[in-house]
Amino acid sequence: MLAKRIIPCLDVTGGRVVKGVNFVELRDAGDPVEIAARYNDQGADELTFLDITATSDGRDLILHIIEAVASQVFIPLTVGGGVRTVDDVRRLLNAGADKTSFNSAAIANPQVIRDASRKYGAQCIVVAIDAKRRLATDVGRLDANGQAVGEGWDVYSHGGRKNTGLDAVIWARLMAELGAGEILLTSMDRDGTKAGFDLALTRAVSDAVSVPVIASGGVGTLDHLADGIQIGGADAVLAASIFHYGEFTVAQAKAHMAARGIPVRI
């Protein structure tokens, strides 16, 4: 069985790592280069770096920060936020990224996933999906294809600001079919709450696609990480708050997961 991965996440805006609750109420967590180096030393399996306001602000890629982070990190680095084109993938890979994450751009132009995957390989193309559970009042409305929707989760774009009307499970399946090598799945309802992953969402998407799924949004305890794997069916778990503010180390997280019978790289 393949080892399951623990991935600290650096949400960055204004050149600083931040963390919020439900995608708002951001507070400062430190310098991205220093934090990345710390996680590298702690034994993280990978790092994910997301410029969370690049798309909504219409900004270009912050390549100078990516280069600085990549110089300190010797584990796979995924970079997202403001990734719009196949050429952006080239620029990020040249800056030191190992994988690039598309979100809003894939919604605007799904073909970019196929094009990027064909040019650079599915192994370095991640599609990030920000999903939010539908309210009872949403059930029965028409989706983007004119079909009445049932219970489930909608996909949001532009840093969680815009409801696309797309169903998260169907969207994940389409992205995998077009060439995404991995799905980074974030529950907006759970983000920053420390209440645990939305395990129903994680399981629904994990069951729907054949590519690895990274569970994100809501980790507050080490058991939450293990639950994402064992109950949610995720291949990797991503967390921010519990690591950024020193509640737990990556090593503690791995030891706990190993004790729960989950294969990890120690």
UniProtKB/Swiss-Prot annotation:
GO terms for molecular function: imidazoleglycerol-phosphate synthase activity; lyase activity. CDD domains: HisF. It is found in: Cytoplasm. Pfam families: His_biosynth. IGPS catalyzes the conversion of PRFAR and glutamine to IGP, AICAR and glutamate. The HisF subunit catalyzes the cyclization activity that produces IGP and AICAR from PRFAR using the ammonia provided by the HisH subunit. This is Imidazole glycerol phosphate synthase subunit HisF. Gene3D superfamilies: Aldolase class I (3.20.20.70). The active site is at D11, D130. Pathway: Amino-acid biosynthesis; L-histidine biosynthesis; L-histidine from 5-phospho-alpha-D-ribose 1-diphosphate: step 5/9. Heterodimer of HisH and HisF. GO terms for cellular component: cytoplasm. InterPro entries: Aldolase_TIM, His_biosynth, HisF, IGPS_HisA/HisF, RibuloseP-bd_barrel. GO terms for biological process: L-histidine biosynthetic process. Its main location: cytoplasm.
